[in-house]
Amino acid sequence: MTISKIVKRINEELAGELLTYGELETFLDQVIDDINHQLDSKFPAFSDFSAETYPDRYPDYNFFPEEYIRNVVIKGAAYKFYVMDEEGIPTAQMFQYNYQDQLFLMLRDYLEYVPEEFKKDGYSAVRLYDVAWKEPWVKYDGI
């Protein structure tokens, strides 16, 4: 999805705000940071995404499926905006629940499909299928 479409959809989520990409970039970066933390990945932040750094992709931010752009990035940026906006604090809680649900679904459904180039080195979770237990109740004697 192009940056202009992302900005348009965020403004629609924000009940017709007219924020520019420059005003939303911080919130978009925060969402990408959350995604990277959840998926143990290194997708580029929007502030690092330019024609110079990604000439083959710019202006289409397509590092993961568009479904997650719509359901996680756009909703997450709207939530991050409402948290910072004094008038939006009552609305922020509804956006928070929706954003957290969608972030969890992204973790559940997309974790194994993160492209190799965007995976961090190492794992942040225990990978139980790498352990050679014969029976779950039998003590494992080493690796």
Q: Language-model features: where?
A:
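Short, amphipathic alpha-helical segments
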Residues: 67, 71, 90-93, 97
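Conserved short "hinge" loops at termini or chain/domain junctions
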Residues: 1-62, 89, 108-143
